[in-house]
């Protein structure tokens, strides 16, 4: 079939080729308007924005004005920035406008491309979000491109992590908003924890343009954004278990699958492919003995007992911390804190914390202060957040390898946009060595040779540790260089700006500096003099003669896309450049995923120490290994989405419930409806009409009403007098209503309505939080059902639905209980109920990677507590010997006094 497809592609072109051909027709129409736009004065060009808005109000569509709008933004860009959109940039803009992904190479001007669909889609007044990966890029792009938008009377907002919510409200109302993916997600969660509509910052999620879309929608797809609060302090347990870990030994095994042979029995096994650690039977026995010795486990009590689940989690976290997570690779120690290093960018992730006790276990391992764990209050994945937008689009230099996932998960087609100038980059064959030491020596020699000829070199590493090893090696060889990793992130912009200078050598961890072009000859100052421009041009020409930027990859990444990102740093906009990867059989990818026969095969080919080979068989093995990992990661992301979709459906119901409450000032009718449902349920539980009278539990019903709802009514007397079920129900409702009416008379109608709303929202939030924790436990345990020949996913759906139904019932019951039992205090203002906040609540960004790396970003926010406030009395109180206003006939002191 693939042969037939190849033949057809050669005859009629690929789908991508045909699509680009069609889009060029639209580009030509835009270009035809260029002379008309040039003839307009600045004021006439600016007035086009209002003209377009008027036409949209007259029922024209955005697509009908696309050609004119793109011509306007192109001309405005020339006048304001002296930058003209190339034809391929117009194609990229059309692709984004159509809600697809535009793959455009490094240096093709994606930042400028985004102005096209952003301007067009902001004309309807619903707003456009341009999403970046960090605050620096959001601020830079907003300042830069904002000049064009402002020229055309469009407002531009910037959302960063350190803004107040008042400033965010203003920013979100702008026509075009630049923001990071993290802040957008957190603001969405915070909005859905607000107590009033006025406290929300976001408006409708209309149109999103995601820059570096592969990084956000693929690399961080399994990254739940979490609002959390602190739980119990287990610092002593973490420290005790940390002291136990050195006593455990690794089990040595050989073979694979069913043919595993235990060569040396041990306490744990390591699954490097899935980044997991498992205790063996010996390990469980040893763990129990050590815990008993430490006083953490009682003699004769099994570690498998339900009450010891937390101990098992702590042990597992400690093992992972010691065995799978390395200092200066996965994290660094900074100011007595464990700071996570982003595996995709090499940047530090200040404030983020791994969850499930992993971060605390690493803190214990490194002997720094152990902070409390957090409990989830609200969460959402990037997958489900970005699917909330009416239209989603994205751009990146590397999307084609993940095109299937973009289509399957997000419904986004990937369109490869041709470069403005053909690429002249030379991708040299990989060089493979037997050991890492030999590989590093070869890299040092390559770098030295390039520096002698004046060719700038960018050395890409996968970790801080490797970047510093190579740096040490270069220092020994007297090779001047710069290191760009998490420890030098403050100097990132300066280092990247000079990375293309003559003879420059830059070591960068993974894709640190991504989003900033490396300019050959170094960066030219914006206000450069003529002499400075001439000097820069000479330097630029010298670098071109030396061969342009040379990329040295120190190992293959697990994803081909990440390798392509590194390659894409070279030969921008048709410049010359070259790339080469240096590998060894000790590299993680080769060691874990490549064939076990690789080493012996290479030795059969005659390899000796210090020698390298270039062989198609090895390259195929590497590519197959990468495909394996990509497939595993895709399956993991898809698996997560299946589970999160269940939670997402429930999340939508809860958030809609909150929105409905916040959208009205008077919730009394809603409360009355809830109260009647609860009373009917009580009747069903105690004295149902479907039961025989002798089976009724009148005493239990009486006690429930009295203790839970503060209603003391003579139920048995009424029943003895022949009062039927319907009349009894009516009297109970009237009794509850009378109590609430009295409270309303005491504090006033408006404060009472506000209090009712606050209690409803707090109750929803509290039990939603508890539900999320229960869902987490269910998800962690449901996979064990597979051993009982049950489908874990179906079991999860079935049980979570039952739990959610129970949650909705519980929320209704607790709302009625709270409003029935609330007491009146003369010294407290009712409006304070909304202001009671838990200052310990945090915004957390959990980043599960191969089911182990769960990171979190921590920013102090304010969220409502579960404490219940009371009213300030505004009217005369009832005397203790006066009749109770509930209608029971009793004195107030013996009823509700």
Curated annotation (Swiss-Prot):
SMART domains xrefs: SecA_DEAD, SecA_PP_bind
Composition bias type Polar residues, residue spans: 839-856
Manner of cofactor binding, per the entry note: May bind 1 zinc ion per subunit.
Subcellular location: Cell inner membrane; Cytoplasm
Binding site for Zn(2+): 884, 886, 895-896
Cofactor(s) recorded in Swiss-Prot or TrEMBL: Zn(2+)
EC number: 7.4.2.8
Keywords: ATP-binding, Cell inner membrane, Cell membrane, Cytoplasm, Membrane, Metal-binding, Nucleotide-binding, Protein transport, Translocase, Translocation, Transport, Zinc
CDD domains: DEXDc_SecA, SF2_C_secA
Stored Pfam families: P-loop_SecA, SEC-C, SecA_DEAD, SecA_PP_bind, SecA_SW
Region (Disordered): 839-897
List of residues binding ATP: 89, 107-111, 517
PROSITE patterns referenced in this protein's UniProt entry, alphabetically: SECA (PS01312), SECA_MOTOR_DEAD (PS51196)
GO biological process, one term: protein transport by the Sec complex
One cellular component (GO) term of this entry: cytosol
Comp. bias regions, Low complexity: 857-870
Gene3D superfamilies associated with the record: Helical scaffold and wing domains of SecA, P-loop containing nucleotide triphosphate hydrolases, SecA, preprotein cross-linking domain
Catalysed conversion reaction: ATP + H2O + cellular proteinSide 1 = ADP + phosphate + cellular proteinSide 2
A GO MF label: ATP binding
Bilayer topology term: Peripheral membrane protein
Description of how the protein assembles with itself and partners: Monomer and homodimer. Part of the essential Sec protein translocation apparatus which comprises SecA, SecYEG and auxiliary proteins SecDF-YajC and YidC.
Role, per record: Part of the Sec protein translocase complex. Interacts with the SecYEG preprotein conducting channel. Has a central role in coupling the hydrolysis of ATP to the transfer of proteins into and across the cell membrane, serving as an ATP-driven molecular motor driving the stepwise translocation of polypeptide chains across the membrane.
PANTHER family: CHLOROPLAST PROTEIN-TRANSPORTING ATPASE, SECA INNER MEMBRANE COMPONENT OF SEC PROTEIN SECRETION SYSTEM
Protein name: Protein translocase subunit SecA
This protein's encoding gene: secA
């Amino acid at each position: 079939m693939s042969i037939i497809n190849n033949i057809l592609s050669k005859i009629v072109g690929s789908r991508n080729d045909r699509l680009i051909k069609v889009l060029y027709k639209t580009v030509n129409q835009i270009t035809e308007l260029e002379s008309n736009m040039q003839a307009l004065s600045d004021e006439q060009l600016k007035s086009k924005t209002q003209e377009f808005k008027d036409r949209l109000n007259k029922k024209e569509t955005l697509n009908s004005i696309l050609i004119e709008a793109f011509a306007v933004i192109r001309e405005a860009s020339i006048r304001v920035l002296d930058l003209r959109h190339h034809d391929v940039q117009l194609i990229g803009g059309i692709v984004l406008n159509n809600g697809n992904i535009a793959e455009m190479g490094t240096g093709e001007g994606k930042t400028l491309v985004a102005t096209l669909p952003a301007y067009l889609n902001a004309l309807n007044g619903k707003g456009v979000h341009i999403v970046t990966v960090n605050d620096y890029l959001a601020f830079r792009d907003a300042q830069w491109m904002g000049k064009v938008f402002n020229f055309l009377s469009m407002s531009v907002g910037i959302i960063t992590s350190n803004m107040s919510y008042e400033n965010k409200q203003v920013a979100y109302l702008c026509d075009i908003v630049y923001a990071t993916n993290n802040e957008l997600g957190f603001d969405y969660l915070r909005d859905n924890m607000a107590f009033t509509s006025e406290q929300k910052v976001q408006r409708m999620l209309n149109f999103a343009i995601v820059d570096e879309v592969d990084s956000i929608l693929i690399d961080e797809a399994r990254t739940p954004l979490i609002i959390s609060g602190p739980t119990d302090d287990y610092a002593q347990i973490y420290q005790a278990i940390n002291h136990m870990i050195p006593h455990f030994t690794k089990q040595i095994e050989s073979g694979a699958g069913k043919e595993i042979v235990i060569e040396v029995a041990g306490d744990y096994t390591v699954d490097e492919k899935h980044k997991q650690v498992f205790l063996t039977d010996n390990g469980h026995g040893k763990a129990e003995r050590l815990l008993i010795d430490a006083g953490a486990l009682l003699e004769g009590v099994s570690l498998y007992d339900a009450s010891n689940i937390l101990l098992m989690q702590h042990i597992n976290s400690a093992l992972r911390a010691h065995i799978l997570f390395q200092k200066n690779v996965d994290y660094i120690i900074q100011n007595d804190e464990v700071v996570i290093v982003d595996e995709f960018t090499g940047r530090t992730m200040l404030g983020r914390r791994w969850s499930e006790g992993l971060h605390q276990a690493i803190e214990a391992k490194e002997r720094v202060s152990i902070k409390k764990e957090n409990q989830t209050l609200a969460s959402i994945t990037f997958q489900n957040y970005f699917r909330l937008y009416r239209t989603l689009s994205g751009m990146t230099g590397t999307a084609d390898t993940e095109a299937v996932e973009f289509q399957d998960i997000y419904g986004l087609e990937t369109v490869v946009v041709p470069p403005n100038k053909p690429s002249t980059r030379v991708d040299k064959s990989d060089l493979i060595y037997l050991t890492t030491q030999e590989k590093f020596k070869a890299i040092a020699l390559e770098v030295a040779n390039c520096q002698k000829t004046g060719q700038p070199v960018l050395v890409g590493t996968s970790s801080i540790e490797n970047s510093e090893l190579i740096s040490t090696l270069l220092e020994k060889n007297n090779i001047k260089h710069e290191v760009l990793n998490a420890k030098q992130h403050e100097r990132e912009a300066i280092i990247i700006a000079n990375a293309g200078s003559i003879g420059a050598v830059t070591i960068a961890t993974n894709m640190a500096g991504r989003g900033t072009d490396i300019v050959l000859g170094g960066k030219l100052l914006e206000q450069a003099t003529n002499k400075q421009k001439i000097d820069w041009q000479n330097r630029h020409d010298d670098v071109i003669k030396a061969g342009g930027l040379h990329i040295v990859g120190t190992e293959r990444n697990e994803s081909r896309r990440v390798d392509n990102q590194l390659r894409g740093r070279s030969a921008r906009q048709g410049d010359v450049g070259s790339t080469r990867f240096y590998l060894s059989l000790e590299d993680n990818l080769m060691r874990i995923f490549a064939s076990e026969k690789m080493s012996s095969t290479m030795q059969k080919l005659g390899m000796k120490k210090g020698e390298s080979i270039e062989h198609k068989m090895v390259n195929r093995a590497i590519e197959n290994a990468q495909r394996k990992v990509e497939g595993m990661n895709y399956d993991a992301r898809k698996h997560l989405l299946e589970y999160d979709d269940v939670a997402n459906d429930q999340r939508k119901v809860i958030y809609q419930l909150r929105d409905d409450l916040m959208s009205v000032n008077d919730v009394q009718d809603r409360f009355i409806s809830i109260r009647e449902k609860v009373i009917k349920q009580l009747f069903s539980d105690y004295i149902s009409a479907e039961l025989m009278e002798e089976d009724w539990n009148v005493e239990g019903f009486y006690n429930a009403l009295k203790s839970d709802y503060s209603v003391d009514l003579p139920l048995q007397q009424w029943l003895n007098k022949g009062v039927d079920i319907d009349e009894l129900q009516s009297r109970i409702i009237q009794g509850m209503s009378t109590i609430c009416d009295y409270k309303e008379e005491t504090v006033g109608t408006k404060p009472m309505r506000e209090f009712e709303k606050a209690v409803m929202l707090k109750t929803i939030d509290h039990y939603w939080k508890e539900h999320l924790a229960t869902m987490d436990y269910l998800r962690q345990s449901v996979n064990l059902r597979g051993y009982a020949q049950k489908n874990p996913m179906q079991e999860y759906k079935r049980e979570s639905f039952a739990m959610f139904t129970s949650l909705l019932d519980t929320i209704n019951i607790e709302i009625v209980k709270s409003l029935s039992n609330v007491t009146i205090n003369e010294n407290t203002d009712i409006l304070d109920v909304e202001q009671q906040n838990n200052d310990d609540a945090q915004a957390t960004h959990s980043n599960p990677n191969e089911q182990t790396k769960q990171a979190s970003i921590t920013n102090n926010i304010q969220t409502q507590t579960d404490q219940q406030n009371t009213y300030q009395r505004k009217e005369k109180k009832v005397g203790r010997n006066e009749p109770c206003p509930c209608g029971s006939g009793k004195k107030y002191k013996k009823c509700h006094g």
